[in-house]
Amino acid sequence: MILNTERLLLRPWNESDAESLYEYAKDPRVGPVAGWPVHTGVENSREIIRTVLSAPETYAVCLKGDDRPVGCVGLSTGERSNLVLPEDEGEIGYWIGVPFWGQGLIPEAVREVIRRAFAELDLTTLWCGYFDGNEQSRRVQEKCGFRYHHTCRDIHWRAMDDIRTEHITRLTREEWEAGTASERKDA
């Protein structure tokens, strides 16, 4: 599945993307705030593509006209989610390389995955989370219509082997439909 937005192409990851992934995933400002360790080399990135990023509905975020990934957005439904969710609900996760911060690219990618989740996959509810201190992620979620739902304190985050506080946000299909209707009316 390939998704298009105004500026982005969202496509499945390929093992040949390992060098581009490593370029951004080696930066300690990217992975740890999102809940995963800094990549240690191109082979580590290749293994992550094989074992994590090859999951269904996980997309390499590429600028149109350039097939190299600069970030990632993914949708995990039901049991594949980090949360305990029914099959008609999903969780969205994302990250983008530091050179692309502040350009509105991840909100654009997330909005397209939201559209697919509700309009094509017929999900009823989407969830997102951000760790304490990750204000950029909180703002992405707000821009995309997610609203605060609850906080999980003192959770052991296995990928980083540390204790974290995660804030969970939610967007229902009805909220999304109301928001897209008002956007069409304003246009």
Go through the PLM ranges and name each one.
Residues 1-33, 62-187:
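Acyl-donor (CoA/ACP) binding surface of acyl/acetyltransferases
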Residues 39-44, 53-55, 105-106, 157-161:
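Short C-terminal domain-edge/linker segments immediately following a structured domain
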Residues 29-50:
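Conserved GNAT-fold acetyl-CoA-binding loop/helix
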Residues 49-60:
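A short helix-loop-beta-strand connector motif used in the catalytic cores of GNAT acetyltransferases and
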